[in-house]
From Swiss-Prot:
Superkingdom field: Eukaryota
Gene: MTB
Annotated source species: Solanum lycopersicum
Transmembrane segments: none
The protein, known as: Metallothionein-like protein type 2 B
The entry's keywords: Metal-binding, Metal-thiolate cluster
Lineage of origin: Eukaryota, Viridiplantae, Streptophyta, Embryophyta, Tracheophyta
Length: 82
């Protein structure tokens, strides 16, 4: 998935918007060392997801006014009313 400032999706005037999470879809998992704070991160616990909606069918997950996010995070095709 391409990213546009962390947000990939078509907004007004076929510009990049806040449609999907893009690069910022997952929380920051960077490592920082601290002697006073303890943090526990648990991964992989939860019910199994059996359906992925539009992603499963190969469609773009974001479409607004006929716009879909292209490979370089420019809306393609652009059929928005401007």
């Amino acid at each position: 998935m391409s990213c546009c400032g962390g947000n990939c999706g078509c907004g007004s005037s076929c510009k990049c918007g806040n449609g999907c999470g893009g690069c910022k879809m997952y929380p920051d998992m960077s490592y920082t060392e601290s002697s006073t704070t303890t943090e526990t991160l648990v991964l992989g616990v939860g019910p199994e997801k059996t359906s992925f909606g539009a992603m499963e069918m190969g469609e773009s997950p974001v479409a607004e006014n006929g716009c879909k996010c292209g490979s370089d995070c420019k809306c393609n095709p652009c059929t928005c009313s401007k």
